[in-house]
Amino acid sequence: MNFETIIGLEVHVELNTNSKIFSPSSAHFGEDPNASTNVIDWSFPGVLPVMNKGVIDAGIKAALALNMSIHQHMHFDRKNYFYPDNPKAYQISQFDEPIGYNGWIDITLEDGSTKKIRIERAHLEEDAGKNTHGTDGYSYVDLNRQGVPLIEIVSEADMRSPEEAYAYLTALKEIIQYTGISDVKMEEGSMRVDANISLRPYGQEAFGTKTELKNLNSFSNVRKGLEFEVERQAKILRSGGVIRQETRRYDEASKGTILMRVKEGAADYRYFPEPDLPLFEIDDAWIEDMRAELPRFPAERRVSYIKDLGLSAYDAGQLTATKALSDFFEQAVALGGDAKQVSNWLQGEVAQFLNAEGKTIDQLALTPDSLVEMIAIIADGTISSKIAKKVFVHLAKHGGSARAYVEKAGLVQISDPAVLIPIIHQVFADNEAAVADFKSGKRNADKAFTGFLMKATKGQANPQIAQQLLAQELQKLLD
């Protein structure tokens, strides 16, 4: 029997506000334990939450970016549960009226086809703290993360393969990153994924019993965990077994999933409206103000790069991987840079430099105008492509004008025959053995002279002109 895979994803995204959702404590990552806390985070008696407007701004932007409807009469709810990292014994979240609902995004699969994935809801909530279990037998609670603003984005169960889940996460991360509301760094916990997966026989309408997957710390692990679950559940069903409703975690060492707990039924969190926060009215003007702050999103940019600039789909995809890279590219083209040449540099030397330095493009001293200027002085013969790589490294580290640096550093390409011919004659004089080989008929010996000349000019000889002049002067040796 063959089975259809049913996947839905829940994605928690930390919003990059300066302060927490209901307290003035810093929301920044990496502080010493409990350094970013105050009486609200510790839930001292009598303290009250104060709404951070920037969180609602971010929620509106996310909802618009994900093609969602917005609840304009929005409230918060209490989600009741006890855990040491939750000192109030409840979490302030949203239940029946999330800020966004009924959305969708398009995903692109590996074969180039596209699919629309529906999004059920996006709701705002506060994050919990973090428990650490020490080797000394004690458990420690760090409340720095308590109250950090989150938006949870819940998809419909529209994905039918691990590949589609991977594509959905890739597209979702791109969109959220473009809005500027989060850096979506999984390694820092600002994007966290839970997956729900079930199988059903083809043709059956009802969903099968789902398994929830946790500990998915990369998109690759999401895909691997789901692939393992497809095989595990199919094997059980084909042998006549029954799938239990479980929570499992992905284990990188075994490349499989491990049981965490069996779910007997749905958790009863006893939601009720948060009495310490008012109803929030989100009027049309507020929504339009947030819409005006949104950029062009990657899908629209890719279409433009292909249609208007003549780039390949691959190049367009690479250039829109991050908003910073895409903005840099567009600024360079607007300054007169050739789209294909700018693209080649960004995907070649620039990408290699960023990877080696562990930086992003907005951390470089290189500016779009200096890159365009460098491309121009390659085209007009001022420098060679080889010298340009050296120039680029300087600009990436120190910035400034490409032409000014080339002139100051003495890197201008030598193209004048009146300068090159005497150097060629000196090369002949310094390499008599090679000249003798050439004269004796060893025609391949002429290739050595190119290297000798480039060494003598420190790589500054114009390659095309140098080759022409070498051929001319070598011929004279035979005449």
UniProtKB/Swiss-Prot annotation:
Instruction: List the InterPro entries hit by this protein, alphabetically.
Output: Asn/Gln-tRNA_amidoTrfase_suB/E, Asn/Gln-tRNA_Trfase_suB/E_cat, Asn/Gln_amidotransferase, Asn/Gln_tRNA_amidoTrase-B-like, GatB, GatB_C_1, GatB_Yqey_C_2, Gln-tRNA_amidoTrfase_suB_CS
Q: Does the keyword ATP-binding apply?
A: yes
MF GO annotations:
asparaginyl-tRNA synthase (glutamine-hydrolyzing) activity; ATP binding; glutaminyl-tRNA synthase (glutamine-hydrolyzing) activity
Any idea which UniProt keywords this protein has? ATP-binding, Ligase, Nucleotide-binding, Protein biosynthesis
User: What job does this protein perform?
Assistant: Allows the formation of correctly charged Asn-tRNA(Asn) or Gln-tRNA(Gln) through the transamidation of misacylated Asp-tRNA(Asn) or Glu-tRNA(Gln) in organisms which lack either or both of asparaginyl-tRNA or glutaminyl-tRNA synthetases. The reaction takes place in the presence of glutamine and ATP through an activated phospho-Asp-tRNA(Asn) or phospho-Glu-tRNA(Gln).
Tell me how this protein assembles.
Heterotrimer of A, B and C subunits.
User: What family does this belong to?
Assistant: Belongs to the GatB/GatE family. GatB subfamily.
* This protein's name: Aspartyl/glutamyl-tRNA(Asn/Gln) amidotransferase subunit B
Organism, by scientific name, is Streptococcus equi subsp. zooepidemicus (strain MGCS10565)
